[in-house]
């Protein structure tokens, strides 16, 4: 609990943990669960604990954002890695039609966006069982050009 006391951004999470809130219960009008709060604050240790206690990694809030979206918006590669390793759906779209990858690009976190692009490509290859890695390089280059701050019209439809 000492870590929570050092970070003023997680007062809500601290309260939830102290009161014994369910890991999947939406605690506020925005329908953000404790896992949303942990991912959105970049708190990988609390995210891991919640995932181990059965948190729903794909639960969406009123904006249609899952914890993966929250982690992408704050640039937490550690939280993204935990969520992906726990089989979070990387292709979920929020109400604006944006994936976590799209949000990472638009929020200025290219390392997170490239990570999600690579994971998506690996999942596509695994699903199709065609190990042509050149397709991944082409997709990554395309996303880099679309991911610039200047180009906001290149939104992908889901």
From Swiss-Prot:
Coiled coil (UniProt feature): none
Main subcellular location of this protein, as a coarse class: nucleus
Keyword tags: ANK repeat, Cytoplasm, Nucleus, Repeat, Ubl conjugation
Tissue localization of expression: Mainly expressed in testis, small intestine, colon, blood leukocytes and in pancreatic adenocarcinoma cells.
Subcellular location(s) of the protein: Nucleus; Cytoplasm
ANK repeat boundaries on the chain: 1-25, 30-59, 63-92
GO cellular component: cytoplasm; cytosol; male germ cell nucleus; mitochondrion; nucleoplasm
Pfam families with a match to the protein in the record: Ank_2
Motif Nuclear localization signal per record, residues: 129-149
Gene3D superfamilies: Ankyrin repeat-containing domain
InterPro entries: Ank_Repeat/CDKN_Inhibitor, Ankyrin_rpt, Ankyrin_rpt-contain_sf
PTM field: Ubiquitinated by the CRL2(FEM1B) complex, leading to its degradation.
PANTHER family in alphabetical order: ANK_REP_REGION DOMAIN-CONTAINING PROTEIN, ANKYRIN REPEAT DOMAIN-CONTAINING PROTEIN 37
Name of this protein: Ankyrin repeat domain-containing protein 37
Annotated source species: Homo sapiens
């Amino acid at each position: 609990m000492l870590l929570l006391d050092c970070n003023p951004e997680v007062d809500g999470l601290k309260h939830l943990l102290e009161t014994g809130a369910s890991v999947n219960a939406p605690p506020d009008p925005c329908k953000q669960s404790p896992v949303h709060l942990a991912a959105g604050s970049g708190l990988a240790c609390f995210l891991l604990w919640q995932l181990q206690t059965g948190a729903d990694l794909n639960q969406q809030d009123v904006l249609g954002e899952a914890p993966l979206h929250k982690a992408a918006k704050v640039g937490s590669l550690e939280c993204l890695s935990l969520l992906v390793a726990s089989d979070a759906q990387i292709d979920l779209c929020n109400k604006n039609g944006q994936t976590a990858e799209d949000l990472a690009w638009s929020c200025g976190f290219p390392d997170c966006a490239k990570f999600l692009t690579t994971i998506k490509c690996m999942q596509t290859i695994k699903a199709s069982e065609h190990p042509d890695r050149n397709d991944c390089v082409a997709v990554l280059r395309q996303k880099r050009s679309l991911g610039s701050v200047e180009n906001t019209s290149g939104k992908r439809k889901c």
